């Protein structure tokens, strides 16, 4: 499974990229707003840090506007991927962009039907939101299972990005299902490092070594 960072915080991207853990980055207007910086500047800087795909989202709601924005965004760097909402106009834009060789990430996927439509339109990636489904009492991970089953049955090459990841279980379970990518907030990625027995083990090793050195 590949790990993308779901953030526009350049410092955090640098921190985790230095560990060799960042295969790509996903952003959205809300994340960039938090940084208080120019949209294009942030995307350009992220692309200079990370070699993998960097998703940048369009704002337009009509296909023509999305395509025009996409063509400007891909000028920033070769690894920019255009994030498109799951709407009819969005699918029209994805169809156009895919024929021009521009990679797309269809976002706000909440059903297997939506994922299938996006794949048929030519999406490079689809982003099903597991956490938001959990929020309304549905099983977000069940959606990942359904999408992986359908894509596998038909040999669909569109990659699945597990999004709206809220805790490590989302990562573990989606990895078991064979999801291609999880896009993870840095606070959740931090939690993947942790286990109480690891901490206890380190403390014991250090205590034993300290006792040995005092002999």
From Swiss-Prot:
It holds the Pfam family TAL_FSA. It catalyses: D-sedoheptulose 7-phosphate + D-glyceraldehyde 3-phosphate = D-erythrose 4-phosphate + beta-D-fructose 6-phosphate. The lineage of its organism: Archaea, Methanobacteriati, Methanobacteriota, Methanomada group, Methanococci. One of its GO terms (molecular function) is transaldolase activity. The gene is tal. One of its GO terms (biological process) is carbohydrate metabolic process. One of its GO terms (cellular component) is cytoplasm. Its EC number is 2.2.1.2. This is Probable transaldolase. The active site is at residue 83. It comes from the Archaea.
């Amino acid at each position: 499974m590949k790990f993308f960072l779901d953030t526009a915080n350049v410092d955090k991207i640098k921190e985790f990229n230095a560990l060799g853990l960042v295969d790509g980055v996903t952003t959205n207007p809300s994340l960039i707003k938090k940084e208080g910086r120019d949209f294009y500047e942030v995307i350009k800087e992220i692309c200079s840090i990370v070699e993998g795909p960097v998703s940048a989202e369009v704002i337009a709601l009509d296909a023509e506007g999305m395509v025009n924005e996409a063509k400007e965004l891909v000028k920033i760097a070769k690894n920019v991927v255009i994030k498109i909402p799951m709407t009819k106009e969005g699918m029209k834009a994805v169809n156009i962009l895919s024929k021009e060789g521009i990679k797309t990430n269809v976002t706000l996927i909440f059903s297997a039907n939506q994922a299938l439509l996006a794949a048929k339109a030519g999406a490079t990636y689809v982003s099903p939101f597991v956490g938001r489904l959990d929020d309304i009492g549905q099983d977000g991970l069940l959606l990942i299972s359904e999408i992986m089953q359908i894509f596998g049955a038909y040999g669909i090459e569109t990659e699945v990005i597990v999004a709206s990841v809220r805790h490590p279980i989302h990562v573990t379970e989606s990895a078991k299902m064979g999801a291609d990518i999880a896009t993870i907030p840095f606070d959740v990625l931090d939690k993947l490092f942790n286990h109480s027995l690891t901490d206890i083990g380190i403390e014991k090793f250090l205590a034993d070594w300290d006792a040995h050195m005092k002999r």
